[in-house]
Amino acid sequence: MIRITFSAEQKVKEYSGKVTGFDILQPDVLKEAIAFKVNGELHDLSREIEADAEIEVIQLSDEAGLDIIRHDAAHIMAQAVKELFPNTQITIGPTIQDGFYYDFATGRTFTTDDLTAIEKKMKEIVKSNHRFVREVWTRKQAIDFFSDIGEKYKVDIISSIPEGENLTVYRQGDFIDLCRGPHSPSTGRVKAFKLMKVAGAYWRGDAKGPMLQRIYGTAWRNKDELNAYLECLKEAEKRDHRKIAKDMDLFHIQEEAVGQVFWHEQGYILYNVLESYIRKKLINNGYFEVKTPILVSKELWEKSGHWDKFRENMFIVDESESKKLAIKPMNCPCHVQIFNSHTRSYRDLPIRMAEFGTCHRNESSGSLHGLMRVRGFTQDDAHIFCMEEQVNSETIKFCDLLKEVYSELGFNEISVKFSDRPDVRAGDDEVWDRAEKALLEAVKEAGLSYELSPGEGAFYGPKLEFVLKDAIGRSWQCGTLQVDFILPERLGAFYIGADGHKHHPVMLHRAILGTFERFIGILIENYAGKFPVWLAPTQLAILTITNEADGYATKISNVLKEQGVRVKTDLTNEKISYKIRLHSLNKVPILWIVGKNEVTSKTVSVRNLGSERQESFSLEKAIELLLKSINLN
């Protein structure tokens, strides 16, 4: 007998032999079911349960169900490509955020017309409602099969699997693909999808390997969700920070400094406003600021462990044959050196050490994307050196600070990913128990929702990742807090405890923005360049209608500059309609228009960005309203 526990109802049923999901689920449940979990592991509904198990049904409404449908769509696309272009070889086709892709080796370049034809063929395959059939093959059987049909990339993948180990393939109609699974019951479950674009990709990500063509697609639960996603993409395209930055003259990136930002005047003003804002928050929350070298000897990176784990992403400089230096990819080992420069007491802890640290990482050129992925960046980095019993209170304080910053920057929807202990880790389980408990309690006390990422913590400690949602519903992982038991020990950091003995501090790595570059990119897209007045690079533009108003405009400008207002004065001879259009394109939030009448009456005509309405105010009142809009508090 096999005992099956249905987790949703907490019911137990017994069966005389092996059963599948189709055997044990009711017809109304099967209608919505995509797959099921058997003792926590995802299975196809057709896969046999061979022993006592607890099951959980996965529906399309679940994230796991949607991911399976996207995986189905990748296989359907591969089948469609093979039917239309038989000489194409298939490689890999995983799911990604919002969709899927498949890499193909082919002598042709896929065109827009090809994508249309592939999509049409996919719809035919969906309509055919082929069953997804899981088969277990031996390694030799799989190599022989894929060799016979000329799929050398599949053979390459299988060859890396240990001899004697079985593998699984999935069959849909006449098409067979190597795959771990699971899949939904049939191709007909894929209701709403669209192919998006073609890009180049190297086999196994190796630039020395063959160049493949990658077709990206998206798949959703229904057509309404698909259409909503496509509309969101259109809006995201309008908000592309690279396009807006060009209109606003914020920054540029060029081939001679790939992945590094040339900040223009307006962009650097924005950068400095954000930095000053964060600096003030840090000071008010008990942090002190430091500055550490950019170029650091290989020896320190070896001690910290980064040389072994991170060397491929480091820019290395040979000072001599025997001495190597590396441009720092992160700040943490340098901060430990400052901690170590004095003998510390338990009474000194916690120590909150912050740095706007300039770092460089050798990211592949294909991964670079405007401000969102760069090689040279500045982190709003800080490290908290504390005792183990202080981890909880410091995490609560950090969560409160992060929520305050995100809210004031316009992000009120925040979630947390909690990553607990991986299989390979340092430290004993009791220490991990206490650290994980401290983080979870802090997140709950801060009123933040969280989801668990089992086993995703670093080998040296658990971590929190803070995800914010922007104006068009996209999620961005920005803030982090990571507990580190290992680095202080490796680098000889200690404090004298109440018992008079040396103890290693716990180190909390934390950031709110992540990097200034990426966060500014997110801000640009969130606001579509229309920043709140306090954050805008230029807060006010004073536009003259006639030369007779030049002196009045200049005098106002000087008064406002003395009060810290970022103001520009346009005294050009252009028509006022042109000036309004120009500064509106530059996303200046407030325009003051002055002509002969305003000079005489000591007034200004106020026009806000996005409005065609102009309102006249006395100069005194206009200044009062302006300063009020600038003041965050």
From Swiss-Prot:
<feature type="region of interest" description="Catalytic">
    <location>
        <begin position="240"/>
        <end position="532"/>
    </location>
</feature>
<dbReference type="InterPro" id="IPR012675">
    <property type="entry name" value="Beta-grasp_dom_sf"/>
</dbReference>
<protein>
    <recommendedName>
        <fullName>Threonine--tRNA ligase</fullName>
        <ecNumber>6.1.1.3</ecNumber>
    </recommendedName>
</protein>
<dbReference type="GO" id="GO:0006435">
    <property type="term" value="P:threonyl-tRNA aminoacylation"/>
</dbReference>
<dbReference type="InterPro" id="IPR045864">
    <property type="entry name" value="aa-tRNA-synth_II/BPL/LPL"/>
</dbReference>
<comment type="function">
    <text>Catalyzes the attachment of threonine to tRNA(Thr) in a two-step reaction: L-threonine is first activated by ATP to form Thr-AMP and then transferred to the acceptor end of tRNA(Thr). Also edits incorrectly charged L-seryl-tRNA(Thr).</text>
</comment>
<dbReference type="Pfam" id="PF03129">
    <property type="entry name" value="HGTP_anticodon"/>
</dbReference>
<dbReference type="InterPro" id="IPR002314">
    <property type="entry name" value="aa-tRNA-synt_IIb"/>
</dbReference>
<feature type="binding site">
    <location>
        <position position="509"/>
    </location>
    <ligand>
        <name>Zn(2+)</name>
    </ligand>
</feature>
<dbReference type="InterPro" id="IPR036621">
    <property type="entry name" value="Anticodon-bd_dom_sf"/>
</dbReference>
<feature type="binding site">
    <location>
        <position position="383"/>
    </location>
    <ligand>
        <name>Zn(2+)</name>
    </ligand>
</feature>
<dbReference type="InterPro" id="IPR006195">
    <property type="entry name" value="aa-tRNA-synth_II"/>
</dbReference>
<dbReference type="GO" id="GO:0004829">
    <property type="term" value="F:threonine-tRNA ligase activity"/>
</dbReference>
<keyword id="KW-0067">ATP-binding</keyword>
<keyword id="KW-0479">Metal-binding</keyword>
<keyword id="KW-0030">Aminoacyl-tRNA synthetase</keyword>
<dbReference type="GO" id="GO:0005524">
    <property type="term" value="F:ATP binding"/>
</dbReference>
<dbReference type="GO" id="GO:0000049">
    <property type="term" value="F:tRNA binding"/>
</dbReference>
<comment type="similarity">
    <text>Belongs to the class-II aminoacyl-tRNA synthetase family.</text>
</comment>
<keyword id="KW-0648">Protein biosynthesis</keyword>
<comment type="subunit">
    <text>Homodimer.</text>
</comment>
<dbReference type="Pfam" id="PF07973">
    <property type="entry name" value="tRNA_SAD"/>
</dbReference>
<dbReference type="GO" id="GO:0005737">
    <property type="term" value="C:cytoplasm"/>
</dbReference>
<feature type="domain" description="TGS">
    <location>
        <begin position="1"/>
        <end position="59"/>
    </location>
</feature>
<dbReference type="InterPro" id="IPR012676">
    <property type="entry name" value="TGS-like"/>
</dbReference>
<keyword id="KW-0694">RNA-binding</keyword>
<dbReference type="GO" id="GO:0046872">
    <property type="term" value="F:metal ion binding"/>
</dbReference>
<keyword id="KW-0963">Cytoplasm</keyword>
<dbReference type="InterPro" id="IPR033728">
    <property type="entry name" value="ThrRS_core"/>
</dbReference>
<keyword id="KW-0820">tRNA-binding</keyword>
<dbReference type="InterPro" id="IPR004154">
    <property type="entry name" value="Anticodon-bd"/>
</dbReference>
<dbReference type="InterPro" id="IPR004095">
    <property type="entry name" value="TGS"/>
</dbReference>
<keyword id="KW-0436">Ligase</keyword>
<dbReference type="InterPro" id="IPR002320">
    <property type="entry name" value="Thr-tRNA-ligase_IIa"/>
</dbReference>
<dbReference type="InterPro" id="IPR047246">
    <property type="entry name" value="ThrRS_anticodon"/>
</dbReference>
<keyword id="KW-0862">Zinc</keyword>
<keyword id="KW-0547">Nucleotide-binding</keyword>
<dbReference type="InterPro" id="IPR012947">
    <property type="entry name" value="tRNA_SAD"/>
</dbReference>
<dbReference type="InterPro" id="IPR018163">
    <property type="entry name" value="Thr/Ala-tRNA-synth_IIc_edit"/>
</dbReference>
<dbReference type="Pfam" id="PF00587">
    <property type="entry name" value="tRNA-synt_2b"/>
</dbReference>
<feature type="binding site">
    <location>
        <position position="332"/>
    </location>
    <ligand>
        <name>Zn(2+)</name>
    </ligand>
</feature>
